Swiss-Prot record:
InterPro entries: Insulin-like (IPR016179), Insulin-like_sf (IPR036438), Insulin_CS (IPR022353), Insulin_family (IPR022352). Pfam families: Insulin (PF00049). This is Con-Ins G3. The modification 4-hydroxyproline is found at P34, P102. Residues 1-21 form the signal peptide. Heterodimer of A and B chains; disulfide-linked. It is noteworthy that in this dimer, in contrast to Con-Ins G1, the chain B is amidated and not the chain A. GO terms for molecular function: hormone activity; toxin activity. Expressed by the venom gland. Belongs to the insulin family. The keyword Transmembrane helix does not apply. GO terms for cellular component: extracellular region.
Amino acid sequence: MTTSFYFLLVALGLLLYVCQSSFGNQHTRNSDTPKHRCGSELADQYVQLCHGKRNDAGKKRGRASPLWQRQGFLSMLKAKRNEAFFLQRDGRGIVEVCCDNPCTVATLRTFCH
């Protein structure tokens, strides 16, 4: 009786874990949901979405982006913050669009060069 009881507890625990994992992933993968992104979260998200595109363009021209060349003189956080701060679209900056107001990942991608 105790062996089957322990087996039942383990099976229920695993089932609960799988259900919780599946439920959580559905909500975190939805990039269409507008979200406020500020500070380092905004900078990290921007770099994650746009950094590869900037590198490819730099390789085609034979040079890297000037901001990324100065990385040795600036801390990584300061470089990300400066890059995100100066991005403009229709007179509105990335902070106004995605921090002051909620924005989607698709909207954030419009700031990629």
